[in-house]
């Protein structure tokens, strides 16, 4: 284990992560390699009355830590048991490691759309995978949790017998947003299909995945900029890493989302005065939750909480909660 203090060589690298707009400001960093190291870090914090925060990739950074930072990047072992179809991932492991080791056995985890995200943080937040409506939350598959105090040091979880999936994406020019939103909203969605709708500036993107065949012809309501759909290895549908950048985002869980309200949300995001990218995921299927939709907002800059809340005002009467998975740079 290495220990870093402000001013030490390596301190800045150790406290940095995927989120470049915020960085932790800890008094000390414990770069742990095993559970015994974690125990020492937690003991250091508790005996000095300091808070302790776990840091792996930094994707989900909400509030910068000022006490003890427990960096788990070196504690990243992954073990696959093809006989029991399970995986054990240490606190610093990322999904790409699990995918690469599981795929030769025809197995796959319930990972999300970014393979460089940490396994533990994602799963503890619930875990909305690219196959969520077909198989449920990633957290539903956890068999065993290993902990030191309140710090999770490893998870053991089920893998699924998945080799190939039916998946793809459609991109449209934003001038066709109204028609695309209506087609997406009216989709008589099979329980085994997990779709998302995302606005990306001048583009509206639809994605979808399932282990079983399904049809998306009804979504082609305008000329497509990208039209890619077919059978492919799970790893190709599991998302590609993005470069580190600055961003702020939040989400709400809704128990209904009428079409007219969805259009108001779209218009509010477009007129926010700052870039606001909207993401919508229908829930249901194997996701055991009262919510019917997950609505998330993200911007490539900080200081936009007010603008996001003004967009969320359009759905306030339908809000039943928030997901821990999609909260970035917010308290």
What is each residue range found by the language model?
Residues 1-331:
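Soluble FAD-dependent oxygen oxidases
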């Amino acid at each position: 284990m290495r220990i870093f203090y402000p001013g030490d060589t390596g301190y800045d690298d150790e406290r940095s992560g995927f989120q470049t707009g915020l960085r932790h400001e800890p008094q000390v960093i414990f770069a742990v390699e095993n559970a015994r190291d974690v125990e020492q870090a937690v003991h250091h914090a508790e005996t000095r009355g300091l808070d302790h925060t776990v840091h792996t990739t930094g994707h989900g950074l909400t509030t910068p830590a000022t006490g003890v930072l427990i960096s788990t990047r070196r504690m990243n072992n992954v073990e696959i048991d093809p006989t029991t179809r399970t995986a054990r991932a240490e606190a610093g492991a990322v999904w790409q490691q699990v995918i690469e080791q599981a795929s030769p056995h025809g197995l796959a985890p319930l990972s999300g759309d970014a393979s460089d995200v940490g396994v533990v943080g994602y799963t503890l937040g619930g875990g909305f995978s690219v196959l969520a409506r077909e198989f449920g939350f990633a957290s539903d598959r956890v068999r065993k949790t290993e902990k030191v105090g309140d710090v999770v040091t490893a998870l053991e979880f089920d893998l699924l017998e998945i080799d190939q999936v039916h998946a793809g994406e459609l991109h449209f020019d934003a001038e066709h947003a109204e028609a695309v939103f209506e087609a997406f909203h009216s989709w008589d969605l099979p329980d085994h299909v997990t779709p998302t709708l995302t606005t990306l500036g001048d583009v509206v993107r639809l994605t979808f995945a399932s282990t079983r065949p399904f049809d998306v012809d009804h979504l082609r309501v305008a000329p497509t900029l990208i039209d890619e759909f077919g059978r492919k290895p799970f790893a190709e549908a599991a998302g590609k890493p993005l470069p580190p950048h600055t961003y702020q985002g939040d989400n709400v869980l809704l128990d209904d989302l009428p079409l007219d309200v969805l259009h108001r949300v779209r218009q509010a995001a477009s007129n926010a005065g700052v870039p606001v990218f909207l993401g919508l995921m229908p829930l249901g299927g194997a996701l055991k939750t009262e919510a019917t939709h997950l609505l998330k907002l993200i911007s490539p800059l900080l200081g936009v909480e007010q603008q996001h809340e003004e967009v969320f005002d359009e759905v306030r009467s339908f809000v039943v909660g928030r997901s821990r998975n999609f909260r970035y740079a917010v308290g």
